[in-house]
UniProtKB/Swiss-Prot annotation:
Catalytic reactions on record: adenosine 5'-phosphosulfate + ATP = 3'-phosphoadenylyl sulfate + ADP + H(+)
SUPFAM superfamilies (alphabetical): P-loop containing nucleoside triphosphate hydrolases
Gene name of this polypeptide: cysC
List of residues binding ATP: G35, L36, S37, G38, S39, G40, K41, S42
Alphabetized GO MF terms: adenylylsulfate kinase activity; ATP binding
Alphabetically ordered keywords of this record: ATP-binding, Kinase, Nucleotide-binding, Phosphoprotein, Transferase
Described function: Catalyzes the synthesis of activated sulfate.
Assigned protein family: Belongs to the APS kinase family.
UniProt-recorded name of the protein: Adenylyl-sulfate kinase
Pathway: Sulfur metabolism; hydrogen sulfide biosynthesis; sulfite from sulfate: step 2/3
UniProt record, GO biological process: hydrogen sulfide biosynthetic process; sulfate assimilation
Organism name: Bacteroides fragilis (strain ATCC 25285 / DSM 2151 / CCUG 4856 / JCM 11019 / LMG 10263 / NCTC 9343 / Onslow / VPI 2553 / EN-2)
EC number: 2.7.1.25
Length: 202
């Protein structure tokens, strides 16, 4: 009899991603929203989740509210911590995607290097980068939390768009300017590219 040298035999018995996607009747994918604070990332993410839910599709939103207060509550806002924040988000997202769950992330993620790292972790075939390209002037005008005003007064250091740069994605799957597009229009454009990616063709 051939000896089994696998010291972790449980992995031979674990269900595959395909098994889970067949159960859910959908494909896992990462929808990564990037853009300035106040650009509309979270608003669009929530509206998209609702539309996908109506179609019987299981989603999970990851954003600053549920990440910074949980798994990343020990991280600050230094450059090192910002990179680690995105790395952990990407690793957690990969677990969801491998379970067949449509994962929606809404983070400023201000430069191409940090977003490319996330794409490498998740896997480029599963990564849809969505640029919410609302101009700074419009984001600053909205300023619901008063963050831009504080940044202008120097009360917040390294604030993206004011005292820290934002690099626009070079080749996003889609760009959405919410100063021009309504929420409904933005979601409809998203559905056009998302639904074909998440649908299983038996």
């Amino acid at each position: 009899m051939e000896e089994n040298n696998n010291i972790y035999p449980i992995f031979d018995r674990m269900l595959t991603r395909q098994d889970k996607e067949e159960l859910l009747k959908q494909r896992g994918v990462m929808i990564w929203f990037t853009g300035l604070s106040g650009s509309g990332k979270s608003t669009i993410a929530i509206a998209l989740e609702r539309e996908l839910h109506k179609r019987g599709l299981l989603c999970r939103i990851l954003d600053g509210d549920n990440i910074r207060t949980g798994i990343n509550n020990n991280l600050g806002f230094s450059e090192t911590d910002r990179v680690e924040n995105i790395r952990r988000i990407a690793e957690v997202s990969k677990l969801f995607i491998d379970t067949g769950i449509i994962t929606i992330a809404a983070f400023i993620s201000p430069n191409n290097d940090i977003r490319e790292m996330a794409a490498r972790i998740v896997g480029p075939d599963d990564f849809l980068e969505i640029f919410v390209s609302t101009p700074l002037a419009e984001c600053e005008k909205r300023d619901v939390k008063g963050l831009y005003a504080k940044a202008r007064r120097g009360e917040i250091k390294n604030f993206t768009g004011i005292s820290a740069p934002f690099e626009a994605p070079e080749h996003p799957a889609l760009s959405l300017d919410t100063s021009v597009l309504s929420l409904e229009e933005s979601v409809n454009r998203l559905l056009e590219i998302v639904l074909p990616r998440v649908s299983r063709h038996e």
